[in-house]
Regions:
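Glycine-rich portal/gate segments that line the openings of hydrophobic small-molecule binding cavities
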Residues: 37-83, 103, 136-139, 143-149, ...
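Short, surface-exposed coil-to-beta transition loops
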Residues: 2-4, 60-64, 87-91
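Hydrophobic ligand-binding cavity/cleft-lining segments
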Residues: 1-45
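Short loop segments at secondary-structure junctions
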Residues: 11-13, 71-72, 97-99
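Generic structural detector for well-ordered beta-strands
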Residues: 6-10, 37, 53, 66, ...
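A conserved amphipathic terminal alpha-helix motif
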Residues: 111-114, 118-161
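Beta-strand/loop substructures that line and gate deep hydrophobic ligand-binding cavities in soluble
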Residues: 79-132
Length: 161
């Protein structure tokens, strides 16, 4: 299954990317209903690994994620190495839409463990949980950086995000 969320922020790509490099950012992006204990987080760098303890649908899990494809002020990705999903790949994109405007895009590709029917039945439930998680995260980003209103001029390249 795939998930994507986009938000236009009133800040430079560098500022938004740098903020994500901070260990405190991860804690701020964690919603109160999804408690997460950081076991090991060496920081964001190519091939760095982070280990967390969290709960999904009330079930406790250790989650180990590896960062890859880290491109300064452009993107970074993380993939689940150990955890509740068969596959989890999360891509964070930072696109400049002017000097002080950043389009932040989160893209997630995930597969649940078990047979295909598990994904069909539980996939929508998990998708809603992921949507709530990223709704919270993008609200945090809007509070941190402010919202850049889309231009309504149909000739503007910023009109479509």
């Amino acid at each position: 299954m795939q998930y994507s969320r986009k938000t236009l922020l009133a800040s430079s790509v560098q500022s938004v990317f740098d903020w994500h490099l901070s260990p405190e950012a991860l804690l701020k992006l964690t919603p109160p209903w999804q408690p997460m204990e950081v076991i090991d987080y060496p920081g964001l760098a190519e091939n760095s690994r982070a280990v967390f303890r969290t709960r999904i649908l009330g079930i406790p899990f250790y989650w180990e994620a590896e960062h890859f494809d880290v491109q300064l002020n452009k993107q970074f990705c993380d993939r689940q190495v150990k955890g509740p999903f068969r596959q989890w790949i999360h891509r964070h994109l930072f696109l400049a839409k002017g000097n002080e405007t950043c389009l932040m895009i989160d893209e997630v590709d995930f597969t649940l463990p078990g047979p295909r029917w598990i994904n069909q039945i539980l996939g929508n439930v998990i998708h809603r949980k992921i949507d709530a998680l990223f709704e919270f995260r993008h609200q945090v980003l809007l509070q941190q950086f402010g919202e850049r209103k889309k231009k309504t001029d149909s000739l503007s390249q910023d009109a479509e995000i």
